[in-house]
């Protein structure tokens, strides 16, 4: 019975995916993923990216966000990206493949950042979903906490943090923690996010000293 349910669910997801207007637009425009459109909508409203910025992209593969950011920060900007999965090269993006949860990978990522203070840390990280919120939400929140810890290490005063969060246990506490560190915090649900998904994006600007 479980297998049948999973098969039906997978088939439904595939049908939704390939008929999704953002997926179709991404394919037509030669974009890495539909995530490009999520970030574009956030940028139109919140103006996170400017020419010359240094940006850290966590959970970067297949590269939709990095691909978008390089169009905003220009040739003098820099994107440092990391993902456990491989990612095809993008001009202007320094990509590190590895598990961000591992100490050696985090150390290598921090070495690539160097002494430069980062203007934006963004995380589109998500665990492998089981479909069980009691399992998926804690795993997701753990990744969100790691992304916030990265902010503490590298984000410049006045910098911004963008993170994907799945609403559930721990969400309000995490939101309070972010509000204690940034002057302005908003919750966004871009049109390109699937309506039935629990995902939202926290946009935090003005990192406090």
Swiss-Prot record:
Active site, per annotation: 164 (proton acceptor)
Compartments, record wording: Cytoplasm
Chain residues that bind S-adenosyl-L-methionine: 63, 65, 83, 99, 124
GO cellular component, one term: cytoplasm
EC number(s) per entry: 2.1.1.166
Highest taxon listed in the record's lineage: Bacteria
InterPro entries: RNA_methyltr_RlmE, RNA_MeTrfase_FtsJ_dom, rRNA-MeTfrase_E, rRNA_MeTrfase_gammaproteobac, SAM-dependent_MTases_sf
Entry keyword set: Cytoplasm, Methyltransferase, rRNA processing, S-adenosyl-L-methionine, Transferase
GO molecular function, one term: rRNA (uridine-2'-O-)-methyltransferase activity
Disulfides per UniProt: none
The reaction(s) this protein catalyses: uridine(2552) in 23S rRNA + S-adenosyl-L-methionine = 2'-O-methyluridine(2552) in 23S rRNA + S-adenosyl-L-homocysteine + H(+)
PANTHER family from the UniProt entry: RIBOSOMAL RNA METHYLTRANSFERASE, RRNA METHYLTRANSFERASE 2, MITOCHONDRIAL
Similarity-based family: Belongs to the class I-like SAM-binding methyltransferase superfamily. RNA methyltransferase RlmE family.
Protein's UniProt name: Ribosomal RNA large subunit methyltransferase E
Designated gene of the protein: rlmE
């Amino acid at each position: 019975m479980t297998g049948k349910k999973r098969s039906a669910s997978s088939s439904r997801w595939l049908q939704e995916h390939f008929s999704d207007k953002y997926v179709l637009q991404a394919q037509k425009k030669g974009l890495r993923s539909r995530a490009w459109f999520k970030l574009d909508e956030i940028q139109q409203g919140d103006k996170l990216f400017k020419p010359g910025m240094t940006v850290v992209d966590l959970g970067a593969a297949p590269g939709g966000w990095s691909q978008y950011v390089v169009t905003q920060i220009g040739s003098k900007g820099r994107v440092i990206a990391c993902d456990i999965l491989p990612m095809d090269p993008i001009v202007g993006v320094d990509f590190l493949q590895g598990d961000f949860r591992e100490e050696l990978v985090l150390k290598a990522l921090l070495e690539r950042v160097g002494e430069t203070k980062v203007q934006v840390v963004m995380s589109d990280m998500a665990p492998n979903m089981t479909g069980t919120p009691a399992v998926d939400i804690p795993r997701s929140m753990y990744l969100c906490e790691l992304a916030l810890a990265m902010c503490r290490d590298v984000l410049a005063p006045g910098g911004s943090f963008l993170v994907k969060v799945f609403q559930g246990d721990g969400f309000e506490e995490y939101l309070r923690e972010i509000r204690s560190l940034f002057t302005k915090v908003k919750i966004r649900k871009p049109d390109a996010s699937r309506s039935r998904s629990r995902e939202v994006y926290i946009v935090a600007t003005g990192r406090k000293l």
